[in-house]
Amino acid sequence: QSYGGCKVGVGDVLIGAAAVAADYNGAAKASHIKDKLIEMTHLNETLYCCGIACSAEGHKTESGNYIIDLLLANVCKQNVTRFPYEIVRLAEDIAGGLMVTAPSEKDLRDEKIGPYIDKYLRGVATVTTENRMKILRLIENLALGTAAVGYRTESMHGAGSPQAQRIMIARQGNLAHKKELAKRIAHISELSLIHISESTRRSYI
């Protein structure tokens, strides 16, 4: 039930790749690009926070081992089933369609069509077309290629599918305690509820 830290490292790479792609596309200064990178960072660091929290709130067992806080660990994993997908979506948005439509390296090296590819697929003048294509291929691999197996589907089902975490959150969430806190603040006595008429009770609801 302690799962999620590895996804943050991959997320850092993907966020960095998206930022480089924005530079190479000449769009890094656009406000919506900046906002997407902020959102990606926010989601990724939230996963990191959850991982740190469930570890810091862990406790020592009788055998001398340490176990993470089960509620926070399952909250972490539940977030892992969602956030990487949104991070990938934003990376694809920033990268642009060329990420999946770019010609092959063989085409780029071709004596006849290579110069045309170099000319028409260049982004900013200071960056080579080859470097632009390299960063897009990296994003493609993390979002859709072989690396996506570990970042997307494994995030969904690794260490338990989403419903497994929800079962544990329901068990560990201590809802009865939360209800008691609310009743205390509202000065509700269970005994007094007996004297409330049915019609009055419905009006509260």
Where are the predicted features?
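Short coil/turn segments at secondary-structure junctions
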Residues: S2, A28, G64-I67, L71
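Glycine-rich beta->alpha junctions and the first turn(s) of the following alpha-helix
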Residues: Q1-N44
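Short, charged, amphipathic alpha-helical segments
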Residues: K34-I38, I67-N74
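Secondary-structure edge/capping motif, primarily at the C-terminal ends of alpha-helices
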Residues: A19-A28, G51-E62, I94
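Loop-to-helix element that buttresses phosphate recognition and phosphoryl-transfer chemistry
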Residues: I38-K60, N79, E92
